[in-house]
Amino acid sequence: MPNAAANEAIIVGGLNPVEGKVFSVPTHPEADEKEVITSDTARTASNGTLEEKIRASSSPGDDTDDRYEDGEDSDNVIIITGGDAARHLLPMRDDHDPALTFRGIILASGLSCFQAVLSQIYTFKPTAVVISGTFIVLIAYFAGKAWAAGLPRGDKYEARWREKGGEGEPPLWIKVVRFINPGPWTLKEHAVCSITATSASNASASVMVFAAQDLFYDLPLSATTVVLTVISIGLFGYGICGVMRPIAVWHVDAVYWSTLPTVKTLQGLHWQELKNSKPLRYFWYSFGAMFAYEWLPAYIWPWLNSVSIPCLASMKATGETAAVLTNVFGGSINNEGMGLFSLSLDWQYYPISDVFTGGVLNETALAEYGLPRLTGTFAYALFMANAAIGALVAHCFLFWGGDFIRAYKSAKQGRYDDRHHAHMVKHYKETPWWWYVAVLVISFVIGLVVVIKENITLPAWAYIVSLLLGIFIAPLSTILYSRYGNGIATNNLSKMLAGLMLPGRPVGNMYFAAWSHNVISNAVTLCNDLKMGEYLKIPPRVMFLTQIYGTILGGFINYAVMIGIVNGNRDLLVNSNGNSSWSGATMQSYNTNATSWALASYLYGSGGLYEMVPIGIGIGAGLVVIHRIFVYFVPTIRGFSSSELNLPQFIQYAGFIPYNASQTCVIFSQVIAGFFTQFYLRNYRPRIFKDYSYLVTGAFDGASLTVLFILSFAVFGAGGPSKPFPTWWGNNVGGYYDLCPVSE
């Protein structure tokens, strides 16, 4: 699959759903069109017919069809809604194997440290690598398999002891062996290990605030500030996640489509045997093929990243003709062109330190240097991003507000429209509400202590406002992402408000954004993991402990690595170029963004050069109001429900290229791949879509990310000096990789 990675950036894992990428929410049928399930009874539909009763397996030996699918007809069902996915795509099988084990905790801790350390290291590398998703699942799989095979197994020793006549409780030494290595590496242990690592990595984005403060501002930075802030942000997001479970986790439409490849990969690795399972064989065939192929576009033959026939046909063009052709059809690197019909077969400086003294605006210096200028395309992208945020808020309330209320009422009555959650209610103790409320209170107090005691230029009242903003936006962002698998970038809203409320304080702006936007981001990620726990039948209280543990562990690990790198390479990181081993480009960009928003009252205020940017919020909301009125009078157009149109996403993508897309060459390939899988396979080959689509996708992701991870150490400069591949026509280092003409 094509990888929309930034230039010289390798993305190993899933994209952050609310960091400038795009996320959304599915249409919800009317209440009488939904199947509502209790945990142990079926109900009669509104038309008087008896709907199918959902049978949850109550023991490992329960061999009902529900352990896998709801009968043979599932193979031909077209997966459209969340109910379709719950009923026909995701099996109900629950082996009731233990989820929390000693080896699982040890491996989860090790994998969490591995992911947190590398994520933090790559933040300061010329080549960025984000380790997550299927890649982590595969590492955990082989690590668990090695543990189970390499150490004495308690189940085997106990079996031998009983064969020799042993009865009752086994001896202490067998119990110890069983505690360390109970038996085969199981699905739930594997999932808990992967989810813990994901929770630990959530802290990496928050730590960017402290790195920027330490590098660019003369403000003290203590371990207390970093660790407590990271824990406060992570836990507050988790507390919000727990409170909005009825709409973001338990709701049948909250599918989290982008996590299904991970779920199907986990289930395939543990539930299917290679010799007897055609889907699992195809998983490894796909993995092997992609592993062998990815070396070409990633290193040897970069032209495969952007195959542009128009560029090939116009290689010798010059002057204005070359410029026009490249601007239209080029797209292999940043700012080259729009990348039309291009196929991807791969997966000036502003004197910031002078203008801001001690993290606060120096108006005398500002008068001397003047205001920074934004490019027209970037200003347009900011406007569209804000319009999408306004549309998101309006769309959620005008189109799905009633659904929110019904979801909480159903949860209070013990009625569930997702059979997976109905099964969880029947067989496992739910995490009490007060646990999550306690997490919210504790994290709030921790953050307040930091704001009051530490010099971070963020007033206590602004801290409270930032959390209230996170509480308001988090449910909207999460419900959108959970239902569509992509969503709306909300990070600009927090930065804009901080800039208007805290003018001239870039450090305070960064902390404000961390306690609002990063809380939102963490809430989305943690809700995604909670839903994955329901799909894999992991007890809710185990999920609670797992995610709390990963969040706290990640705070300490990320701080330790960050402070070591910054103190050891300060001059290189502050320097605009760095070297082949270390680069402060990410921190510099982050700090520049904060600086821009710290001047919001000058740039975006009334009479400012970019005053239309914040007005975009109102325009986006107004468009959704018009859409809602249109739906009222014109509910359908030729059989298509007009309410299906999701304006927030439409608006977001209208400004996508100048704000999000570093390589436009991948867009056309993504459209083709999406049309093939989501339209053709989903509608005309539903069995192939159900059995292979997500599994093969997981294999492609895992293989390509494994190759990129190896290359980052071997040749891309992550583990030493970079070693570029020799120049040839398929690796046009001196020009554009897609061979578009270079205008003079």
Where in the sequence are the language-model features?
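Alpha-helical multipass membrane-protein architecture
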Residues: P2-E744
